[in-house]
Amino acid sequence: MDNPVKETSNFIGNNNIEEFMLNSINANKLHHAYLLSGIKGLGKATFAYRCTKYILADTLKKNMNVDNSEKVSKLIESDSHPDFIVLKKDIENEKSLIEIDQVRDCINFFNHTPIFGGYKICIIDSLDEMNINSTNALLKILEEPPQNSLFFYYIS
């Protein structure tokens, strides 16, 4: 497992929030953004990835379990799903914050219609790792989101 957060199929102890989200998704009553807050290791990223997989799989189920062998899971795990983007600090290039160029790429991402016809989804990991310029650039799209866009962002 390269990234346990992306690949986990278990989300223990959070049945209420998952049931709430599942009902919202299945009733097609999603908000455009969800802020997840809590201590590190609580499951914020796991929840965001589970929701993303379920929404992009575009199948109604009784739970949000999407098997890791399904196409949508493989595309998300390999960061190659055309309707999904993650903003996070670039550790490989020793960046300590989410850069403005990443936010610009995200805005451009949302300027195109979804490839598979459903939602375009962005996970922002983590909002408190953005500089002021990145935050301000992101604010515009959060205030006036394109149709069928969805953001999950979390803070510690």
Where are these regions (language model features)?
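Clamp-loader machinery-focused feature within the broader ASCE/P-loop NTPase space
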Residues: 1-133
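Conserved catalytic/switch belt of AAA+ P-loop NTPases
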Residues: 111, 136-153
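A short beta-strand-to-loop transition that corresponds to the Sensor-1 phosphate-sensing loop
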Residues: 125-127, 153-156
